[in-house]
Amino acid sequence: MTNVLLVALGGSIGAVFRYLISIFMIQVFGSSFPFGTLVVNVIGSFFMGVIYALGQMSHISPELKALIGVGLLGALTTFSTFSNETLLLLQEGDWLKAILNVVLNLSLCLFMVYLGQQLVFSRI
């Protein structure tokens, strides 16, 4: 039951962060490209790599994994919004932005998970 509450707490924090980051990105770059979703996915991917690496080396408790990995990062990142925004770009006929969105999300997020893991593994 404790882990469920930790996931809920982390999720509420992650959802608020996602909302604030998305609003900020729209204010800075406008809404013609889903930069907010890209940024939260990239940030979340980096920290997921860190959490995974720490977990592999038993330097993080199951409770902290639940709070940060499942709760906070699960709510911060969003595959469903990424998918919806990509589909909307396709429906609007903006194939270039849709393809760019897919390529950037996948390549940057994979790289950031790797970078987060390597940062931890190289320091310990």
From Swiss-Prot:
It comes from the Bacteria. One of its GO terms (biological process) is cellular detoxification of fluoride. The keyword Nucleus does not apply. Keywords: Cell inner membrane, Cell membrane, Ion channel, Ion transport, Membrane, Metal-binding, Sodium, Transmembrane, Transmembrane helix, Transport. It catalyses: fluoride(in) = fluoride(out). It is a multi-pass membrane protein. Na(+) binds at residues 74, 77. Signal peptide: none annotated. GO terms for cellular component: plasma membrane. It is found in: Cell inner membrane. InterPro entries: FluC. Its main location: membrane. One of its GO terms (molecular function) is fluoride channel activity. Na(+) is not transported, but it plays an essential structural role and its presence is essential for fluoride channel function. The chain crosses the membrane at residues 4-24, 35-55, 60-80, 95-115. It holds the Pfam family CRCB. PANTHER family: FLUORIDE EXPORT PROTEIN 1-RELATED. Belongs to the fluoride channel Fluc/FEX (TC 1.A.43) family. Fluoride-specific ion channel. Important for reducing fluoride concentration in the cell, thus reducing its toxicity. This is Fluoride-specific ion channel FluC. It comes from Shewanella sp. (strain W3-18-1).
